[in-house]
Amino acid sequence: MTEQRPIAVLGGGSFGTAVANLLAENGHAVRQWMRDPEQAEAIRVHRENPRYLKGIKIHPAVEPVTDLLETLTACDLCFVALPSSALRSVLAPHAERLAGKLLVSLTKGIEAQTFKLMSEILEEIAPQARIGVLSGPNLAREVAEHALTATVVASEDEELCERVQAVLHGRTFRVYASSDRFGVELGGALKNVYAIIAGMAVALGMGENTKSMLITRALAEMTRFAVNQGANPMTFLGLAGVGDLIVTCSSPKSRNYQVGFALGQGLSLEDAVTRLGEVAEGVNTLKVLKAKAQEVGVYMPLVAGLHAILFEGRTLNQVIELLMRAEPKTDVDFISTSGFN
């Protein structure tokens, strides 16, 4: 089904561009909004986003634009791919225009000042809008290169989920639905922290046993925290949980993994982020997650360890020693064992 009105993608980064291309390839007119007029002109002229997706041709049906008000007026369905630090400031001035719109967040981050997820910010800005999130093991370049990929659209609004499935589902991109918006979105935000740890481990030459341990203990930490916050633990066994965690912690294409790898090579955090040239949400998420875990009393040793390295002056060897000497806990402690007695 082709949408009668154009579809908006807000954000000129790598994943926003990949989603814009998918929509256009499925026969939809797309308005991709970005702040930078030079970036918009480069895409318009060269049909490529050289800064974020170099070498990927942009479909002719993707129109790069810089007028946000006009874009919101023209489009009913909007995919929001703005950095977590910018989402509120960009959209709040246009709150009235968002009423009744279908807003689907693509951003895997947490607002530092409030610990709100992106869909919660959208809900706060535009309470009359219909809100969803899209999350999963979706590396932007692989999506753009048509690697076989699956994702999850999550909302309690079934019609919104069906609309998103209809416009995005294609021969290489499969869209599943979930009603656990909070769990799907939280999983996407939390895993970025562990990708930094995984990148560091690889740069330091740690073995496959270590990488496997990190991923599985990361899943335990994520799920423990998510259950404390009210999410469904089963969500973390799906694409938006363990699926996203595996790809982000295993692939050099992952931005957060790249930051961790650079740190493992001896670069400072500032230099690692500068070398990346894009937003790595995991760095910001780490700060707020460490504070929140302490506040609510959730045991997250990997989060605490990475925070100690990046912000408290601890060395990696010191943190490893503390982690390995800590009292062993149960392996899977977020599922009730009452049925096994």
From Swiss-Prot:
Main location: cytoplasm
Top-level EC class as recorded in UniProt: oxidoreductase
Superkingdom: Bacteria
Catalysed reactions, semicolon-separated: sn-glycerol 3-phosphate + NAD(+) = dihydroxyacetone phosphate + NADH + H(+); sn-glycerol 3-phosphate + NADP(+) = dihydroxyacetone phosphate + NADPH + H(+)
GO MF term (any one): glycerol-3-phosphate dehydrogenase [NAD(P)+] activity
Annotated EC: 1.1.1.94
Protein family per UniProt: Belongs to the NAD-dependent glycerol-3-phosphate dehydrogenase family.
The encoding gene: gpsA
Keywords assigned by UniProt, alphabetized: Cytoplasm, Lipid biosynthesis, Lipid metabolism, NAD, NADP, Nucleotide-binding, Oxidoreductase, Phospholipid biosynthesis, Phospholipid metabolism
Positions bound to NADPH: S14, F15, R35, K108, A140, R255, V279, E281
Protein's name in the database: Glycerol-3-phosphate dehydrogenase [NAD(P)+]
One cellular component (GO) term of this entry: cytosol
SUPFAM superfamilies in alphabetical order: 6-phosphogluconate dehydrogenase C-terminal domain-like, NAD(P)-binding Rossmann-fold domains
Organism of origin: Pseudomonas fluorescens (strain SBW25)
Record NCBIfam families: PRK00094.1-2, PRK00094.1-4, PRK00094.2-4
Pathway this chain belongs to: Membrane lipid metabolism; glycerophospholipid metabolism
